[in-house]
């Protein structure tokens, strides 16, 4: 939503809960990223992640995620996520389960909560609209093109259509 807003688009985020009530607030550990190449490598990060998935995950997806992790952490830092810092002001990292190297970036023991609140605050700052307590039912398809979605308004008990030029489904997990 934040990146789409850069194009001066009208953005609407629809959620079955309030944005700050998701399971992300429970995530404590942190996010793995190779920030400093002299101490770690993306290749080792890829190997660790693939091994931790019992070699069941798509290795190309893991590669893409690990290659983009550094930029993602620095972007989160730039919008205000309060990552812990070392004495020389670098983003602090700690060792976490299943890793050979120290690469987990964290915000005390509230990493998910801090990231979620920072992203939500950024959305509010960017005037991104939210419709909460809307349960997704179906996509609206016309001539093989998605033109929106149908939702159940949990509060009012009504079915509502929301039309859109672009529909993005981000289900988490």
What are these regions (language model features)?
Residues 15-147, 151-158:
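Conserved N-terminal/central alpha/beta ligand/cofactor-binding core
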Residues 3, 23-24, 167:
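Hydrophobic/aromatic ligand-binding patch that stacks against planar heteroaromatic rings
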Residues 161-172:
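Short hydrophobic core segments
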Residues 1-13:
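N-terminal Rossmann-like FAD-binding beta1-loop-alpha1 element of flavoenzymes
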